[in-house]
Amino acid sequence: MLILRGAPALSAFRHSKLLEQLKQKVSAVSGLYAEFAHFADVNDVLTGEEQQVLDRLLKYGPSVPVQEPAGRLFLVLPRFGTISPWSSKASDIARNCGLTKIQRIERGIAFYVEGQFSDADAQAIADSLHDRMTQLVLGDHAQAAGLFSHAEPKPLTAVDILGGGRAALEKANVELGLALAEDEIDYLITSFNGLGRNPHDIELMMFAQANSEHCRHKIFNASWDIDGQSQEKSLFGMIKNTYEMHSEGVLSAYKDNASVIVGSVAGRFFPDPDTRQYGAVQEPVHILMKVETHNHPTAIAPFPGAATGSGGEIRDEGATGRGAKPKAGLTGFTVSNLQIPGFVQPWEVPYGKPERIVTALDIMIEGPLGGAAFNNEFGRPALTGYFRTFEQSITTPHGDEVRGYHKPIMLAGGMGNIREDHVQKAEITVGSKLIVLGGPAMLIGLGGGAASSMATGTSSADLDFASVQRENPEMERRCQEVIDRCWQLGDRNPISFIHDVGAGGLSNAFPELVNDGDRGGRFELRNVPNDEPGMAPLEIWSNESQERYVLAVGVADYERFKAICERERCPFAVVGEATAEPQLTVTDSHFGNSPVDMPLEVLLGKAPRMHRSVAREAEIGDDFDPSTLDIEESVQRVLRHPAVASKSFLITIGDRSITGLVARDQMVGPWQVPVADCAVTATSFDVNTGEAMAMGERTPLALLDAPASGRMAIGETLTNIAASRIEKLSDIKLSANWMSAAGHPGEDARLYDTVKAVGMELCPELGITIPVGKDSMSMKTRWSDEGTEKSVTSPLSLIVTGFAPVVDIRKTLTPELRMDKGITDLILIDLGRGQNRMGASILAQTHGKLGRVAPDVDDAEDLKAFFAVIQGLNSDGHILSYHDRSDGGLLVSTLEMAFAGHCGLNLHLDGLADNVSELSAILFNEELGAVIQVRQDATPLVLAQFSAAGLEDCVAVIGQPINNDEVSISFLGEPVFSGQRRLLQRQWAETSYQIQRLRDNAECADQEFDALLEEDNPGLTVKLGFDVNEDIAAPYIKTGVRPQVAVLREQGVNGQVEMAAAFDRAGFNAIDVHMSDILAGRVDLNDFKGMVACGGFSYGDVLGAGEGWAKSALFNSRARDAFQGFFERSDSFTLGVCNGCQMLSNLHELIPGSEFWPHFVRNRSEQFEARVAMVQVQESASIFLQGMAGSRMPIAIAHGEGHAEFRNDDALLEADVSGTVALRFVDNHGKVTESYPANPNGSPRGIGGMTTLDGRVTIMMPHPERVFRAVQNSWRPEDWNEDAAWMRMFRNARAWVN
């Protein structure tokens, strides 16, 4: 084993943060140093040259001074007997670089902690430094040899029910955490007595997972008595009623991993499977929709819990039909009170929590990062979401109890696209190969299905922890690339059946696969790819290692499928074959036995149906009189409540421009304020049709009136999605995610009544279907605190997500008030019809109250009329701005519109109230509704349209936006409230800022927060030195000659399709080229005029961002010669964007004229930054930027490592004067800047892109390929038609070729 010291592992900011955390745990800690340590398992002595290559491979990341370590060593390594995702990627890179003597490379972090401390202190320090699920801590480098030792497999065990009877099974139930119910234990004893043998532990675990509440939805399928009355339908039956009443537009419901609805016809853009040339295929592009929850894991370990929640939902989409493509994501969090240190709010009363779960604040720091990191690395934009906190002590008939979200809601959802011919799964033929695609088995996430089905606190802490999985998004990206290559083959698609691997691991996925295909299966356990060979059969079969799919591939299609996997470097294995008889057999060649041999009907068959006999409880509530409150203090409290406050800290960490198909993200207008009501994507690059999604949830209302909370969730979804241009209301389809503390007094009846209100009444009245959903029935946390039994129970929680095809993505409305449209009016549409019900409002919550009467949807006809009028007015161009009314009420809606429009407000409430005591209720009630801005000369027409639709009593003109910073509200001519927009926006932004300060580099957070005080910030602007609507490539395109450009990707790259689309539009033939094609000699770069290295996370950024990719080219002789030859050709050009920019900067030794280039390292904020930034094009030789010098315009950025690091100040100066700086970040005034967030990565002198001395090779961190169409820009000038300014760059390349 070779031991190689690595670079320091912590930046100055992370170092001081960790040191502070350690000191809080152990006060004797006085110092800390951390560096990477690398360990290589070699089968022979390396030559001097090989050693040199290895040393260069392991030198990566920013230049931080190396120290001589002092203090006690805590060496954190991957758990022995496992192979970390880092190791498998780094070992792949080493092999690609010709280091064949290296069996495996592994990495740890050596923490040196100074101070005098006891063994107990040392244990506390070790606990803080590692994740015990995947890591261990040693005190000596030499002990790391255990990384490469091979454990012997553990044997199978049987449970003796023939001898020990029921007691033996009950004991196994507790020890294995199976969560079996009494009738399930009876069922298993009967079944195995019938088979005449004892069950194996693996069979019991498999049964427990497949039949857990998580997988079987027993409560939703149960029969019900309420108050002694038998109920006609099950919960699921009432949801299905929506489909039975209105099934039009739904292509698949209730039977697959996601639901499918009808989309639009467009030119679906992808590479031809045979020629690899990108092109558009005109066909129906249908929409798939799915929303999942991952609540239990997120409470225990928020980063991996939320990451694997997102990953699982993405796999659900990809595994729909015969393979589909995920497109855009959403995320949601509901937690208890945050209690931010130094920023605790008056309503946040500390109650405590059990040891086994983390705090609400920790969930909101780590969970969103986990979800965002997975989406970012996979390559899916995160475009909408919600965030709510709720924790309150309430009085019930049983005494006081705390209601809240110690067990959080973590929602991960999204939409994708699927081909018409692939919506339904195909037949699994007998003999079909049953394949696992993706990562290896590891002892991760055991028993997750059963664990998440229990109330938190009813299982052991170790079992809770064991049930959390860990993530490897780059592996999932490779799997998706395989699925994409398969569906792109059309009727030659080798996949006949596919499922994702989720709860229960293979023990649930393979039986489900063969059972759904009306087959049985014969499997060999040792064929399962396994990075932890010491596992017992139960652990191999039931672990929940992520990033895996199971597929059935016909024998005739197998070779085609195998070739695709090899090109994409995606691991797969044939684990079994499909049989005609419905028997499940798993053999084990190592031990020569059969751990599983049972009829599928025992596993998945007639387990007893649950019956629920429950009673309704009296509704609860308290007196709340808003008229007695000070309005100014109310405003401050409401603006700081997390459900109302800015969600910026949740948004800028997530890529929102990847795919180049995003038409509306959360950030609105020239000042990029996070207030959008819905998310919108384009169907493809050649059309203006698309898809919209929006969310609705009003969970605290359920404490007062559960059915009202369900109706309001649907209502809010509709008032949100109404901002997009949708043909008709019935085009909208809903996902319903139900969370309940089943068994808690009154909650089961509340659940039943709410499902009935939604499924049997409101949705049928609206003509809307719920074709997909999910339930989580154990939303309660129990613990003992110094002998006192405590619990926190969630309110019944329905989270609704709406999805719909969009007829024109250019007509999406936003809350940005327009000050360039003459005199305008603000009109309130109040669907509460003046009732102003204040129950469970944010205002009530910020005073520790609930109130008594909840807002509600009183009449479905009003909602239908509202939607139709808004769509008509939008179609006719009458609405300038739109925002729904929700949390915080009318005051918050109008303020958010003013924040987005950077203007003041003059509101008068005369038409809404009879006397001054009603004003608080008018300003803060959360009845359904919206505020629209219209030109004053159109106001009579707009009011008339609402009147004609029967909404005359719902509409009122409430004021005007004004062109200054003042917000004033009056009643009968008397001032009610006044304030400065800037200061109100700071209050609204402060909660987000406080969390950002704790999580990221505090200096950057301070700069961004202080920028809100700037009075004359003009926002994003465009100043062009060319005509955006001129196509300079047109004459060359007319010749019919289309030069070839190689669209280059490596495993983990995810930005290739939009890059190809931009070059294709500019008149090139874009060809899909994988690095594996170059290494294998399948592709010759001499065939290409141009090459572009695309964005993403090559090798998951292992060995540095873009560095592993670059080194696999530098140290592989075939690849090195190919690249060097290409760069030296005077007729070739090259572009590198984001990850491609990082990669090319590491190839500078092969690129003539690139000696001034920097190395790109971690952003100064220490965070992934996804924003719209202003850049200025510099005078340079870049062939891409000719005729653009001096132009200033916005561009999409999305990266974690974009900071340009030069060797020293002299090197920076040389670069500056060499004329090779191509782009610089500027602030909104057009000045070159290093300040955050205008310069999102802190690069010196604003450097954002470089070129070579002759201009043939250009690299940049921003993403022009994501904003080449006008509609792809989050904000754009109105005179941009189809093309955006960045299209010029690609056309310049086409003109240069001629």
UniProtKB/Swiss-Prot annotation:
Pathway: Purine metabolism; IMP biosynthesis via de novo pathway; 5-amino-1-(5-phospho-D-ribosyl)imidazole from N(2)-formyl-N(1)-(5-phospho-D-ribosyl)glycinamide: step 1/2. Signal peptide: none annotated. ATP binds at residues 305-316, 384-386, 676, 886. It is an enzyme of class 6 (ligase). InterPro entries: Class_I_gatase-like (IPR029062), FGAR-AT_N (IPR040707), FGAR-AT_PurM_N-like (IPR055181), PurL_large (IPR010073), PurL_linker (IPR041609), PurM-like_C_dom (IPR010918), PurM-like_C_sf (IPR036676), PurM-like_N_sf (IPR036921). One of its GO terms (biological process) is 'de novo' IMP biosynthetic process. Residues 1045-1298 form the Glutamine amidotransferase type-1 domain. It comes from the Bacteria. It catalyses: N(2)-formyl-N(1)-(5-phospho-beta-D-ribosyl)glycinamide + L-glutamine + ATP + H2O = 2-formamido-N(1)-(5-O-phospho-beta-D-ribosyl)acetamidine + L-glutamate + ADP + phosphate + H(+). Residues 303-327 are annotated as: Disordered. Its main location: cytoplasm. SMART domains: GATase_5 (SM01211). It is found in: Cytoplasm. Mg(2+) binds at D677, E716, N720, D884. Its EC number is 6.3.5.3. Phosphoribosylformylglycinamidine synthase involved in the purines biosynthetic pathway. Catalyzes the ATP-dependent conversion of formylglycinamide ribonucleotide (FGAR) and glutamine to yield formylglycinamidine ribonucleotide (FGAM) and glutamate. Monomer. In the N-terminal section; belongs to the FGAMS family. PANTHER family: PHOSPHORIBOSYLFORMYLGLYCINAMIDINE SYNTHASE. This is Phosphoribosylformylglycinamidine synthase.
